[in-house]
Amino acid sequence: VSEISPSRLPSGRHNLPREFVVTSQRDRLLDSMAQACAEKRYAEVSVADIVSRARVSRSTFYEIFPDKEACFLAAYDAILGRFVTDLIKACDDPDLTWPEMIERGIEACLRFLAAEPAFARMCIVDMFSAGPAALERYLSAVRMIAAFVDGGRTMMPERDVVPESIAGMVIGGAAVVIRAEIVDERTEMLPEVGPDLLYAILVPYMDKEEALERSERYAERLGLVTSS
């Protein structure tokens, strides 16, 4: 079953609107790009790989995308849109404290990636070999999340105690951990690193005992440890 469930057209002649046909073909190409990258490195994926999986012609591919990179970027943009929607939904509660929002955000992020292993690999591993435009999209997403984490400085009695740059460093480190799990083919187990990531993100902004306590409660909720 396709991870993004691209619509399939009926075989043979049909009277479907042209817009519907193009949308279906485009969705299938995006899914095929992700699936191909899951099996090969981006540099090794060819247009032939993509169209054969999508069951569309090479000419159809070039009617929709000018090249392989454009298809890759479109797939990334599509999955990032869904990721951001899930993240916003998870944190959209005015009663949540900042640490609670961070925990909700981490859990939503890791569950999303675990459920979309092909796209997780494409967006977090293959971005680095897909050219400057792809890398800029990746860095933009990291900066977006870092800006959210930087809200923790408002919790500090003196905001200048924690430099603004810390958020970017923490999120960059978290991304390395996530990338390593994906490369080691542990994508479906990503939620298990959530408690450790929570501690790493919270500890620059609060007492380390409180950060550890929140991390341990998170682990208990996931069933990773049992309460004494």
Residue ranges, per PLM feature:
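Short, structured motif recognition centered on aromatic/hydrophobic residues
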Residues: Y42, F83, P99, R121-C123, ...
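C-terminal peripheral helix-coil segments that are non-catalytic and often amphipathic
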Residues: V1-R13, R111, A115, A147, ...
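Alpha-helical DNA-contacting segments of helix-turn-helix folds
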Residues: V21-S24, R28, A36-C37, F65, ...
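Amphipathic alpha-helical packing segments from all-alpha helical-bundle domains
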Residues: P132-M155, E164-V176, P191-Y199
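Short, amphipathic alpha-helix enriched in basic
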Residues: F20-D49, S228
